């Protein structure tokens, strides 16, 4: 079934020879794509001659749907083998690990992931997403197999930490190719809704991770925590193959026009003349490292990720040890947080596009205020309160926090040229994971152990306030960029209407003369 669905490249290549007389042989160029020293099989594919308009209109929608499903399945799969330490935190604690030990192990993955997401993005922007994403998933799966193998006997914190670091490096190969595919196949004006829909991969993957781990512990024994790593990894190998068959890197490599041309929707930040002559590093430095708006966005991501991981990573342990729940109830809280994020993410994307007209920062601020209220509900009830109270608070927190998580990644794509969009998103991700996730794992673990959970919750609320301030700073520049993009789009459409009117007038005059 897969082969019959995904062999369009071979079919289309065969039809090209028969349609030589009608095919526009103008090459569909990928403007200013960086040069690459990657192995030939991993490089971004070269553009092919443009296909006839009838063929373009038939193929474009189908491939857009196909690649979207591909990056959805692919990125959700990474989550099946990412945050599994948190899911077995209570079991690890019963086996002698302290909160600080667990925090360090979890932080090794998050820290490595943050750096990898940035540096992998600089490679991914020159690589074929069809190969790059499945490759990272397979390598991450193999690392989780090694974690399961090394689990026999006494738990070694150092070995565990090293393997989680390696896992984090390969995990960083997931988001950048997905972001690259998103900017090449979906235009700016539609990207809010599409990005929101794709972003629920965080929640789908996270929730399925909890379900797979719960099944593994139930089937292979509640003390067999190694199964929480190797069992989901086996599933990921299959999903990596499916991802490979679905994903296509960019429209031009399929003989299609760019999405900006196809939808008449220019990018907010276009490739300029300097981008075409300077090195990739010079472009990154100019558009990202020396761009105050991008720096504000990166620091906002620090505090958003502190809240995201500070809540969900410690939920299984907090619910078991403080709220008196079982291990399964703690894992249920983790999954509730993730599942609720689906609704919140979709709602956030809709509000961002329809209510605030693309002003992502304002939408993020509104959602972060809601996160503060959810954290208070999670913290303030007495320890003997029913478990549904804590689950409700986690549902609200998950539904609200994933909106800003999605928006910041989307803003990084919107506020940078397409050929370094993945790197821009990787830059904000680097800050989110290297700093935010560190504070969420090691930081909150140390605060809770030495100062109590009350101090940890106060810390989370402070982080939420700081994220609101930084998003306010980003909003000022965002308004300016959006105004320029709308003016340009309106000018192009006005010109097209004038040309169409002139053509109609010319045709009418010709008919009168005849």
Please annotate each region the language model reported.
Residues 126-137, 354-368:
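Cytoplasmic membrane-interface "Motif A"-like loop-to-helix N-cap segments
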Residues 192-213, 217, 341, 429-440:
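Glycine-rich segments within core transmembrane alpha-helices of 12-TM secondary carriers
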Residues 163-201:
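Cytoplasmic helix-loop-helix junction between adjacent transmembrane helices
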Residues 85-87, 290-346, 405, 437-441:
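Extracytoplasmic gate region of multi-pass secondary transporters
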Residues 198-252:
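Helix-loop-helix hairpin linking two adjacent transmembrane segments in secondary transporters
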């Amino acid at each position: 079934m897969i082969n019959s669905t995904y062999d369009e490249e071979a079919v289309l290549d065969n039809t090209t020879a028969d349609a030589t007389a009608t095919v526009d042989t103008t090459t569909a160029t990928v403007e200013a794509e960086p040069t690459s020293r990657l192995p030939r099989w991993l490089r971004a594919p070269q553009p092919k001659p443009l296909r006839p308009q009838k063929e373009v209109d038939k193929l474009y929608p189908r491939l857009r749907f196909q690649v979207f499903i591909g990056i959805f399945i692919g990125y959700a799969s990474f989550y099946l083998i990412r945050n599994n330490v948190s899911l077995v935190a209570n079991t690890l604690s019963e086996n002698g690990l302290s909160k600080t030990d667990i925090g360090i192990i979890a932080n090794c993955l998050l820290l490595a992931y943050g750096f990898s997401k940035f540096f992998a993005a600089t490679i991914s922007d020159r690589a074929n997403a069809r190969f790059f994403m499945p490759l990272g998933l397979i390598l991450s799966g193999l690392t989780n197999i090694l974690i399961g193998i090394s689990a026999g006997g006494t738990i070694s914190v150092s070995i565990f930490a090293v393997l989680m670091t390696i896992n984090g490096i390969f995990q960083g190969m997931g988001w950048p190719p997905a972001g690259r595919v998103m900017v090449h196949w979906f235009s700016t004006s539609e990207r809010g809704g599409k990005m929101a829909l794709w972003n629920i991969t965080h929640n789908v993957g996270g929730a399925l991770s909890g379900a797979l781990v719960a099944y593994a512990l139930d089937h292979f024994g509640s003390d067999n925590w190694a199964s929480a790593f190797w069992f989901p990894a086996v599933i990921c190998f299959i999903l990596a193959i499916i991802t490979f068959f679905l994903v296509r890197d960019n429209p031009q490599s399929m003989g299609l026009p760019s999405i900006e041309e196809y939808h008449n929707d220019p990018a907010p930040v276009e490739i300029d003349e300097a981008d075409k002559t300077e090195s990739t590093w010079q472009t990154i430095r100019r558009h990202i490292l020396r761009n105050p708006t991008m720096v504000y966005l990166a620091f906002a991501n620090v505090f958003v990720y502190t809240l995201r991981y500070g809540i969900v990573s410690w939920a299984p342990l907090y619910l078991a040890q403080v709220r008196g729940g079982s291990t399964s109830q703690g894992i249920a809280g983790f999954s509730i947080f993730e599942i609720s994020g689906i609704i919140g993410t979709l709602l956030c994307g809709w509000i961002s596009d329809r209510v605030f007209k693309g002003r992502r920062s304002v939408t993020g601020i509104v959602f972060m205020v809601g996160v503060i209220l959810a954290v208070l509900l999670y913290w303030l009830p007495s320890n003997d309160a029913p478990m549904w109270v804590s689950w409700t608070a986690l549902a609200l927190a998950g539904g609200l926090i994933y909106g800003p998580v999605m928006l910041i990644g989307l803003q990084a794509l919107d506020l940078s040229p397409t050929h370094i969009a993945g790197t821009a998103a990787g830059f904000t991700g680097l800050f989110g994971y290297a700093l935010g996730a560190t504070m969420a794992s090691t930081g909150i673990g140390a605060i809770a152990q030495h100062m109590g959970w009350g101090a940890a919750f106060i810390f989370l609320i402070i982080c939420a306030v700081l994220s609101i301030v930084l998003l306010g700073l980003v909003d000022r520049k965002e308004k300016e960029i959006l105004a320029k993009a709308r003016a340009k789009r309106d000018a192009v459409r006005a010109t097209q209407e004038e040309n169409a009117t002139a053509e109609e007038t010319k045709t009418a005059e010709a008919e009168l003369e005849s």
